[in-house]
Amino acid sequence: MGKRASETLAASYIKEYGLNVKLCRPAYIYGASSLTDDRVWAQFIANVVKKENILLKSNGAANRSFCYVTDTASAMLCVLLSGENGFPYNIAYEKSNTTIRGFAKTACEAFPERNIMLSFQNSEDEAEPQILKTPLSTEPEILDSTRLKALGWKPSVTLSEGIKRAVKVLEEQNR
């Protein structure tokens, strides 16, 4: 079931049965997953764990909101305890908004001693993509967490720090 459909169903239950429902819209949640996870961010983290170069299969221009798993959990608790019934709260750390390319670069830069390089499957993707901002352009994958922060939530894990934590956990699990 889609996210919006779930929210509509929740709104119906609030109206029909008076249920107390809190709604969260999380960004891309990242953290220590598994080394075989096929999500792109998880593949980049696995590359760092395995000390392998990162290969992008596109120009990596897609913009995303990311939020480390512990920040996401604390945000959900904040919404549960202080959020308005039936009101959706976006969970994102604006300082972690980046492109897929940016996530890959951050993963490489988080461990400079490993000399992990970023490469591209297609040479035409190597040039830094131009991301045009126009009044008509929208970025549905970028979330605004202003309402959540108004409840007192404060994210604390930067993208680089989150990648370092995830790598550390995976290395400990795979010894």
Model-derived regions, located:
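Active-site Tyr-X1-5-Lys
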Residues: 1-22, 49-50
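Hydrophobic alpha-helix immediately C-terminal to the catalytic Tyr-X-X-X-Lys motif of short-chain
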Residues: 5, 9, 13, 44, ...
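Short, cationic motifs built from Arg/Lys/His that form the positively charged side of catalytic pockets
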Residues: 3, 25, 32, 64, ...
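Active-site-proximal flexible loops/turns
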Residues: 10, 32-38, 78, 97, ...
